[in-house]
Amino acid sequence: LNLASFEINFSNIGKIKKGAKVGVTALTWATNVTPIIQLGLIPVVVDISIATLNVSPETLTPHLSNIDVFFATNVLGFADKIDVIRKMCKKHNIVFIEDNCESLGSEVDNELLGNFGLAATFSFFVAHHISTIEGGMIVTDDENLYTALVMARANGWDRNLPSDKQAALRKKVGIDAFSAKYT
């Protein structure tokens, strides 16, 4: 799921460029770091606050000038000053993505985690808060990212998109009426 999130951002909508440095929480899981490496991105470990087990504005500050993306893991439903971190990322043009595999339903100042970054991932692995044995979801309010995610879910087909989005995409990439039957 994290691989999908990064790959879509990286290759399909161009928010993340190859070789970009991605800040990752020091307390994380291999499934957060491995996709970064697989896609030719460079992980940069950002220390945590021992009080919250998460990156804090203070631990993120030294990295603001040398990362392009920040992938925050909200451990055990906690998020240390995430609104401040969101503003810091925005000010420095850093793409902000949340990992909420342990934070489904958690709130900060009456705002659900998963609403702070460009996208947020949630895991439904057997050991997490909601389980379907495997799988997960990505949420976003970015229309381009959403469209790319819907198409990725359908192996690149545009069938699950509204007809106006299908028409716009087909026009953009030059797919004629005959070929459109197979997209």
Each model region followed by its residue ranges:
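Buried hydrophobic packing segments
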Residues: 1-5, 36, 136
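Active-site region of PLP-dependent enzymes
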Residues: 103-109, 116-183
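Short hydrophobic "helix-edge" motifs at membrane interfaces and signal-peptide entry regions
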Residues: 30, 89-90, 115, 131-133
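ANL superfamily AMP-binding
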Residues: 1-21
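PLP-dependent aminotransferase-like
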Residues: 16-91, 95-100, 107
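Structured loop/turn residues at beta-strand edges in well-structured enzyme cores
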Residues: 17, 65, 114-115, 131
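A generic local structural motif
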Residues: 4, 9-10, 57-58, 82-83, ...
